[in-house]
Amino acid sequence: VKTLKDAGFKKLIVTAKHHDGFCIWDSKYTDYDVKESGYKDKNGESDILAEISKACTDQNMDMGLYLSPWDIHEPSYGYKDENGQPTTPENDKKDYNEFYNNQLEEILGNPKYGNNGKFVEVWMDGAKGSGANAQEYNFQKWFDTIQKYEGKGVDGRDADCMLFGAEAYTTVRWIGNELGIAGKDTWSKSKVDKNANTINSNKQGNATVGFEDGNQWTVPEADAR
């Protein structure tokens, strides 16, 4: 983190859980985490997210949280009956939305995570894998949880937590590629429909260029791999 700070970086977004479902903190909601891997730091703790958070706090580096909604490992993902077979939402035996919300609470509600206990952005991604599209996300519940801990006015915060990949609630949008390339002319607004929970950021070629007359401010964020 010090190297990033010295290089001029202002924020670090840490991948606490990617699509594979593996958690880099000791989550009480799954055994697919860093503790079960046998990893321990010099103090005998199994919590990489806490280690990174401490480093960001020491360097006063803003933190963002990447917590993938798509979870290949979690049995409650999708709609399944008591035998684990695909079913309809009303017959679903385990609520994945509650599982994900519990993990949000577990991280955002714990002061040892984040820069001095704070996250300025939650990166939710937008991916759903093959066979997983039936899972509908309860975005409103999740966003209420995020802003409860990270919203404007909470412990002196002067702005709401930024949201990436949050459909119509997005305030930080994907630029449209993983090449670090943005359009020459890019507007910082998208067109969203809260009722349909959709967002249109005007994809042209390999980049989203936004709209001059959009109805929601969505900061375009470029990433490269």
Where are these regions (language model features)?
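Mature catalytic domains of secreted/periplasmic carbohydrate-active enzymes
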Residues: 1-225
